[in-house]
Amino acid sequence: MATLGVNIDHIANVRQARKTVEPDPVQFAFLAELGGADSITVHLREDRRHIQDRDVFLLKETIKTKLNLEMAATEEMLEIAKKTLPDYVTLVPEKREEVTTEGGLDLKSNAQYLKNFVENLKHSNIEVSAFIDPLGEQINYSKEIGFDFIELHTGKYAELSGSEQYKELQRIIESTHLANDLGLVVNAGHGLNYNNVKKIASINNMNELNIGHSIVARALAIGLEKSVREMKSLITSN
């Protein structure tokens, strides 16, 4: 049965819109855990557009579940991860001009650099995941580089409908099976919401789904704890 990782970046987005101290994502992480979140995900971007360094450190000290730190593979982020010691790190591509992460890492073109980067994190006993598109080549490189997990990018699945969405779902299923055969733990995320999550959650050996925007959007209407409970129920009711 898949677990639920709640991404709280959008709480920080609201705070940073006014450059003030509220809403505090650390407080909302606590509410997400009350609602059943199995882990908390934050993306510390190089431009600090939402999550700030203090958020990461405070979350590590206060949350009761696990902390998943999404970050680019840079020396600055490596040092922050080694100081913070999150439960695991998910390496993601990053462009300053993007609104949100647009696609998976290209592991092939950065294989040696990423291998050294992953080894460095593992020396600090941090497990490492790669955010990748559901492609066989990228999954094979994930194993070769030494990642413990992969997170399959579900953005395309979320954007499509009908037969095209079905084809993308099959690609995600096949990618999950390939990764499992290679000994990789499989997470998934991006664009998942209350209407499309169940088919992804029902994939055999899917470990965790990382979801943020749809939960936060629904929380504006019904409250965060309840919105997390509803998503958790959808994931676990297979």
UniProtKB/Swiss-Prot annotation:
3-amino-2-oxopropyl phosphate binds at N7, R18, G191, G212, H213. It is found in: Cytoplasm. The keyword Cytoplasm applies. CDD domains: PNPsynthase. It comes from the Bacteria. One of its GO terms (biological process) is pyridoxine biosynthetic process. Keywords: Cytoplasm, Pyridoxine biosynthesis, Transferase. It catalyses: 3-amino-2-oxopropyl phosphate + 1-deoxy-D-xylulose 5-phosphate = pyridoxine 5'-phosphate + phosphate + 2 H2O + H(+). The record marks E151 as: Transition state stabilizer. GO terms for cellular component: cytosol. Pathway: Cofactor biosynthesis; pyridoxine 5'-phosphate biosynthesis; pyridoxine 5'-phosphate from D-erythrose 4-phosphate: step 5/5. It is an enzyme of class 2 (transferase). The active site is at H43 (proton acceptor), E70 (proton acceptor), H190 (proton donor). 1-deoxy-D-xylulose 5-phosphate binds at D9, H10, R45, H50, T100. Signal peptide: none annotated. Its main location: cytoplasm. One of its GO terms (molecular function) is pyridoxine 5'-phosphate synthase activity. Its EC number is 2.6.99.2. Transmembrane segments: none annotated. Homooctamer; tetramer of dimers. Catalyzes the complicated ring closure reaction between the two acyclic compounds 1-deoxy-D-xylulose-5-phosphate (DXP) and 3-amino-2-oxopropyl phosphate (1-amino-acetone-3-phosphate or AAP) to form pyridoxine 5'-phosphate (PNP) and inorganic phosphate. Belongs to the PNP synthase family. This is Pyridoxine 5'-phosphate synthase. It comes from Prochlorococcus marinus (strain MIT 9312). The gene is pdxJ.
